[in-house]
Each structure stands twice: as structure tokens, then as C-alpha cells.
């Protein structure tokens, strides 16, 4: 058998190219975390893996290998091979990987060669690639300056970031809009998958000629997705650009995000009746998540207004009353909290302005700092 191995030096290229990957680990391993371009076509399913693992602990490697062959043979073995071949027919450039790039990868490669197809497997497997991506995140703040985009809730930071080539949308990667009402209909990624996606986004960003990495000023937790500690710490010391927006535009934007888009999404997913029920639950549960911070009296006031707005929406198909609780939530909760947090970083603020003014400022910042960083005389002075 000819062993074809993809060395660890090619991890960068694998992730930047989005190379199709066959993950040979059991589903329980895959579900904890994998890579965006991977598909789970396991050599052994969960129960088979568990039996082999127990055998390995009690009787050693050779006995475990023998048990694995007895569990995956005949029709079962052929089904696994057929699944790999079907994927490879659509993705002939794919690579294999298991947990460490060991027996599972080698055995699968052998079976595929016997079926007439040679497929490389990745050195180090999942563990090696995962450690590489963790290193990418840890190194990122030292490679270029971080710039933090701040702004009150509803100021349109996410839409702004999507128009900037030097930006990475952390909330998009986390599939959560960051606030207590930021939950989306689809679930968030696992913590491992969030980190893997962030690392790959950083690799793509580093390919561009950007003077900085622009990120939204986030909390440590984006929903349930935790920013890696070293990366979050670097964000806390970054210079800040503050996006300013009129209150009426903020209210209209939040009405669209919290009410119109979420209502429409739930109905498309669940139908009219169940969709509205799920939408109502989303709003009331989101409000309930900040009950302690609001205090009993303010929470009850907001809940009453929200329930009235839901009733009006259900019976009259009108959403204007939602503006009442959104306005109260902004002015009594989000805005004071935002001002308090921003005041602690006031010394880091470089610029404040509207969407247009901030775009213009960032264009100038990008141009000036790019030329400075690529000036050979400046580089020479910085060295000595």
C-alpha cells in the first residue's frame, strides 16, 4: 500500500482553500467540534467506537484492532466504503482525517486504495489541525492592530461591518446578535466550531492588505459563544471608533430585527400558529433573561407592554406598539449600560461619527496606516 500523507505544513492551505475533508471520527466526536469544510463519514459509529475503546483499555491495541475489524466487515464495511466513494466522486480533491492521523486514517486509505481510489490523509489529524487554529487566534493580535467598533444598541454595527473589507463579523460567526434579544432561529455553533470558524476567518483576513483588524466591541460571551481569553484581552485594549445613530433610526432598526425578521423567520419555519407562539416565547424569554438586572418593577412594566404589543400584532396584524417596549428598553437599560462601559475606555476612542463619516475616517485610516507600514524607511527606523 502507498501511504499518501498531507504534512502539517499545509494546514494553512487546507483552511484557506476550504479543502473538502472526510472526518472519519465517530459522530459523537464530530458533534463536539469539526471544521467547516468537513463531512462526517465515520469508520466506526459511536457504539462501535465505544466497544473498541473499552477493549483497548482492557486488552491492548492488537485486541482492539481485531475487534474493530470484526465490527466493521462484510456489508457494514462495504456501506462505509460506498459512502466515502460517493463523496469522493463529487469531491475528488478531498482529504481524510481522524483524531490524530493514525490507524483510522491509515485503514480507510488502505480500503479505498483496494477499491481503486487513492486519497491522502492529513498528518496529525483533527488534533493537529485544531491546535494549529488555536495558534492562529492567539497570534492574530500581534500581527496587526485591532480596532474596535462601538455604538449603542441599534446603531447598525453589523451592517456597517459587512461593508468593510478589514472587518470580521464575530456575531455572524457566533450566529448571535450579541444582546439579550440576539438569539437567532438556528442554534449557535459549538464552542469548538465557533473558535475554528474564527481562526479560519482570521486566516482569510490576513491574506488581505489591511492596516488593521476591525471588530465589533463585544462582551466576552456572544450568546453562549465565548471569545478566546487572549483574543478578548487584546480587544479590551484596542483603539475604538464609535458609530453614532439617531434614536428614531435605532428604534426602526430594532423593530425590524427583533420583531419583523424574527416573526417572519419563525412563521417560515413553523407555520402561522406555531410560528407566532415561538416568536412570542422568544421575546418574553429574552426579556426574562435580564429580569434581575432590570429589577422587578421595570421588568413587569416591560413585560406588560410587550404582551399588549403581541396581542395587537396577533389580532390586528400591527407591530407599531412594539416600539413602546423597545424604546423603554433602550433608554432605561441598554443605553445607560453602554455609556457606563464606554466611559471606562474613553481614553481609547479615536473617532465618533455617523455611518458615512466613520466609513470615510476608516478609509483614511486604512490608507495612511497601510502606507506607513509599507514604507521601507519607516520600517528601517522602527528596527533601529
Swiss-Prot record:
Pfam families: Rhodanese (PF00581). The keyword Transferase applies. GO terms for molecular function: transferase activity, transferring alkyl or aryl (other than methyl) groups; tRNA 2-selenouridine synthase activity. The active site is at residue 98. Gene3D superfamilies: Rhodanese-like domain. It catalyses: 5-methylaminomethyl-2-thiouridine(34) in tRNA + selenophosphate + (2E)-geranyl diphosphate + H2O + H(+) = 5-methylaminomethyl-2-selenouridine(34) in tRNA + (2E)-thiogeraniol + phosphate + diphosphate; 5-methylaminomethyl-2-thiouridine(34) in tRNA + (2E)-geranyl diphosphate = 5-methylaminomethyl-S-(2E)-geranyl-thiouridine(34) in tRNA + diphosphate; 5-methylaminomethyl-S-(2E)-geranyl-thiouridine(34) in tRNA + selenophosphate + H(+) = 5-methylaminomethyl-2-(Se-phospho)selenouridine(34) in tRNA + (2E)-thiogeraniol; 5-methylaminomethyl-2-(Se-phospho)selenouridine(34) in tRNA + H2O = 5-methylaminomethyl-2-selenouridine(34) in tRNA + phosphate. SUPFAM superfamilies: Rhodanese/Cell cycle control phosphatase (SSF52821). The keyword Transferase applies. GO terms for biological process: tRNA wobble uridine modification. Keywords: Selenium, Transferase. Residues 15-138 form the Rhodanese domain. Its EC number is 2.9.1.3. NCBIfam families: PRK11784.1-3, tRNA_sel_U_synt. Involved in the post-transcriptional modification of the uridine at the wobble position (U34) of tRNA(Lys), tRNA(Glu) and tRNA(Gln). Catalyzes the conversion of 2-thiouridine (S2U-RNA) to 2-selenouridine (Se2U-RNA). Acts in a two-step process involving geranylation of 2-thiouridine (S2U) to S-geranyl-2-thiouridine (geS2U) and subsequent selenation of the latter derivative to 2-selenouridine (Se2U) in the tRNA chain. Belongs to the SelU family. Monomer. This is tRNA 2-selenouridine synthase. It comes from Shewanella sp. (strain MR-4).
Amino acid at each position: 500500500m502507498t501511504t499518501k500523507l498531507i504534512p502539517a505544513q499545509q494546514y494553512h492551505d487546507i483552511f484557506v482553500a476550504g479543502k473538502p475533508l472526510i472526518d472519519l471520527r465517530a459522530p459523537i466526536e464530530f458533534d463536539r467540534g469539526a471544521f467547516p469544510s468537513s463531512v462526517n463519514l465515520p469508520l466506526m459509529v459511536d457504539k462501535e467506537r465505544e466497544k473498541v475503546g473499552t477493549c483497548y483499555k482492557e486488552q491492548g491495541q492488537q485486541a482492539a484492532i481485531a475487534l474493530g475489524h470484526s465490527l466493521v466487515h462484510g456489508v457494514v464495511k462495504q456501506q462505509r466504503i460506498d459512502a466515502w466513494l460517493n463523496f469522493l466522486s463529487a469531491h475528488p480533491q478531498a482529504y481524510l482525517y481522524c483524531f490524530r492521523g493514525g490507524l483510522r486514517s491509515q485503514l480507510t486509505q488502505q480500503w479505498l486504495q483496494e477499491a481503486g481510489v487513492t486519497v491522502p490523509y492529513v498528518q496529525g489529524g483533527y488534533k493537529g489541525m485544531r491546535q494549529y487554529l488555536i495558534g492562529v487566534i492567539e497570534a492574530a493580535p500581534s500581527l496587526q492592530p485591532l480596532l474596535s467598533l462601538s455604538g449603542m444598541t441599534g446603531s447598525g454595527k453589523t451592517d456597517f461591518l459587512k461593508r468593510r473589507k478589514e472587518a470580521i463579523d464575530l456575531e455572524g460567526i457566533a450566529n448571535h446578535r450579541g444582546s439579550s434579544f440576539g438569539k437567532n432561529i438556528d442554534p449557535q455553533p459549538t464552542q469548538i466550531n465557533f473558535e475554528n470558524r474564527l481562526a479560519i476567518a482570521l486566516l482569510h483576513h490576513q491574506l488581505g492588505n489591511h492596516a488593521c483588524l476591525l471588530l465589533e466591541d463585544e462582551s466576552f460571551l456572544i450568546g453562549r459563544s465565548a471569545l478566546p481569553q487572549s483574543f478578548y484581552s487584546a480587544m479590551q485594549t484596542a483603539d475604538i471608533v464609535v458609530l453614532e445613530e439617531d434614536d428614531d433610526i435605532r428604534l426602526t432598526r430594532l423593530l425590524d430585527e427583533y420583531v419583523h425578521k424574527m416573526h417572519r423567520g419563525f412563521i417560515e419555519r413553523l407555520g402561522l400558529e406555531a410560528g407566532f407562539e415561538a416568536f412570542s416565547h422568544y421575546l418574553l424569554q429574552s426579556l426574562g433573561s435580564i429580569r434581575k438586572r432590570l429589577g422587578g418593577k421595570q421588568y413587569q412594566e416591560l413585560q406588560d407592554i410587550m404582551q399588549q404589543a403581541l396581542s395587537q400584532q396577533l389580532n390586528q396584524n400591527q407591530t407599531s406598539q412594539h416600539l413602546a417596549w423597545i424604546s423603554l428598553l433602550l433608554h432605561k437599560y441598554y443605553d445607560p449600560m453602554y455609556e457606563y462601559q464606554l466611559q471606562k475606555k474613553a481614553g481609547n476612542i479615536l473617532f465618533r461619527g455617523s455611518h458615512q463619516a466613520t466609513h470615510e475616517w476608516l478609509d483614511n485610516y486604512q490608507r495612511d496606516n497601510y502606507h506607513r507600514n509599507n514604507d521601507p524607511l519607516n520600517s528601517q527606523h522602527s528596527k533601529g
